[in-house]
Amino acid sequence: MVDKQPFVWVQVDGEEKLATVNLVPGNQVYNEKLVQMNGSEYRVWNPFRSKLAAAIMNGLEDFPFTEKSDILYLGVSTGTTISHISDIIGQSGIIFGIEHASRVARDFLDRVASHRKNIVPIIHAVSYTHLTLPTILLV
């Protein structure tokens, strides 16, 4: 069943699961289940790995992102939530995703940003605190 929201509910093993239309069909970010339905591929959005998914499942009233949104996302970690937001905003939107921890930043670059053209990764080294965000964006 498709809602008017930018996400959908899909049936998986007899249960309703939150999902987004996969912007990169065939690509998984965190080993999430892929579901084929109505000619589209959906990625199940795990609320135990994403606070935004948990908020939606608990009745979030004002969902802030739509197709074509422009977003600055601080602390992308390994990319679970940002990947689903990427699905939602589509090719017409853009996300500037910032991460400072080098290990998780590598995972984010390998698993997410390298596959999604609507994500601009910004890896901010905290050891360079004299650089501000505008400086980083201009480099």
Where are these regions (language model features)?
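N-terminal auxiliary segments of SAM/dcSAM-dependent transferases
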Residues: 1-30
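Conserved alpha-helix/loop element of class I SAM-dependent methyltransferases that forms part
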Residues: 47-67
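Conserved class I S-adenosyl-L-methionine
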Residues: 68-77
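Conserved SAM-binding loop of SAM-dependent methyltransferases across substrates and taxa
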Residues: 78-90
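Conserved SAM-binding motif I beta-strand of class I
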Residues: 94-99
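Short alpha-helix immediately C-terminal to the canonical SAM-binding loop
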Residues: 105-106
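Conserved SAM-binding strand-loop segment of SAM-dependent methyltransferases
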Residues: 117-125
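Conserved small/polar residues in nucleotide/adenosyl-binding loops
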Residues: 129-135
